[in-house]
Amino acid sequence: MSSAAEYQLNPYLGWQKEQGIPIHTGFFVEDLRKVRLGFWKGRNANGAFINLSNAVVNDAVVLEVPPGEKTVPRRQLFDESVMVVEGQGATSMWYEDGRKKTFEWQQGSVFAIPPNVWHEHYAMSAPARLVSCTSAPLYMQLFNNNDFIFNCDYKFLDRYAEEENYFVESPQLLRGFKGIETNFIADVRQWFTRENVYALEEKGGFRQSRDRAST
């Protein structure tokens, strides 16, 4: 539990409190589908923060978009990775003077939001619940200037250059490392099946790290 003094000294905790939505603390969350939410006016959605114990660099945010609604467009300097807990919908992303690119997602989808890119989420006929992991705590404590964090127009073209296939599932194998690199996974529950792991091993993806660990 964060004290009143911590909220005054920590820019991120102070910003959290200003959003007016529940802040859950502790060592774990048993079921993200059942986390209590509150209306987040700044996002036009229901939301909650999750402050896991001793997590000072990253945070977790639960966002539930009502059926047929969309979130308020936002951009931010920090990184954000999103997983769809429930529902179906779509996300649009664009630079200030660029063209919108929209991709669809479903339960189990995982995608990354590049820094300083405008984005908004849409829900289809049922509520869509998303959980995000961001580096907002680090950035807010580092800069202590939310206008800069949420209104910087610098384009990180090395991260996102408006490529047509940016949000297409096309994982790149990280050789010698137990993992993949991708901007979008249609359903993470299906991706890491035994068959896919074996396929990666045949390409030299996982076996190398296993061998190294066993020596």
Predicted feature descriptions by range:
Residues 54-56, 95-116:
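Short acidic-glycine-tyrosine-enriched beta hairpin
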Residues 69-72, 90-91, 109-121, 127:
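Histidine-centered metal-chelating micro-motifs
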Residues 1-57, 155-215:
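A short, N-terminal "cap"/entry segment at the start of jelly-roll beta-barrel domains
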